[in-house]
Amino acid sequence: PRSGECRIFGEDIQRMQPVTRERIALLIENHVQYTFMNIEQIERFYSAFYPKWNKEAYYELMRKLKVAPKQKISRMSCGQRSQVALGLILAQNADLLVLDDFSIGLDPGYRRLFTEYLREYAKAEEKTIFLTSHIIQDMERLVDDCIIMDYGRILIQKPVKELLDTFTRYTFKISSPDKLPHDHGRAFAVNGEL
């Protein structure tokens, strides 16, 4: 956006009090540091910085995602590192979780598992989650309201249910796309799918 103001919990974000900042957990891309630690060590390290730390939330997610407690972060895949970062965010026990492309590196199965877990967690713990994602289908069960933007301009802003009721998606399979007239063939997706 090129104008306006941003307020969180009633405060301007540029002049926010430290006590208000404690209520916010932020996850950005490429988010795991201290890769020489294992998941137990990094949990203990982070816990010292957050007064409302909830280690049960961290370890519950690690168990659900089957991440071994002594596993070194440096030996983890990108997806596993994302899982650790997500656990650290949940353990901060913040009122507002801001997740920027949280699913980067997670395969579809783990994305689905984490999305389900996040939905249950937010409801049970009464948390607000603000997230961005390029994978819309994962968000249908998680998001109440949706804003679709294009280079800072809002294209659509409405509740997800209303958005889904407004638009319909069709998929057509063409057995022989090479037999379509030349000028029509370019309008169809590659691999015979529309």
Task: Give the residues covered by each predicted segment.
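Conserved coupling/switch loops of ABC nucleotide-binding domains, chiefly the family-specific signature
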Residues: R2-E5, Y151
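Conserved ABC transporter NBD signature motif
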Residues: G4-D12, V19-T20
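Helix N-cap at the start of a conserved alpha-helix in ABC-type nucleotide-binding domains
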Residues: P108-Y110
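ABC-family P-loop ATPase nucleotide-binding domains
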Residues: E22, I28-V84
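Catalytic Walker B motif of ABC-type/P-loop ATPase nucleotide-binding domains
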Residues: L97-D101
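Short loop immediately C-terminal to the Walker-B catalytic DE motif
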Residues: S103-I104, I136
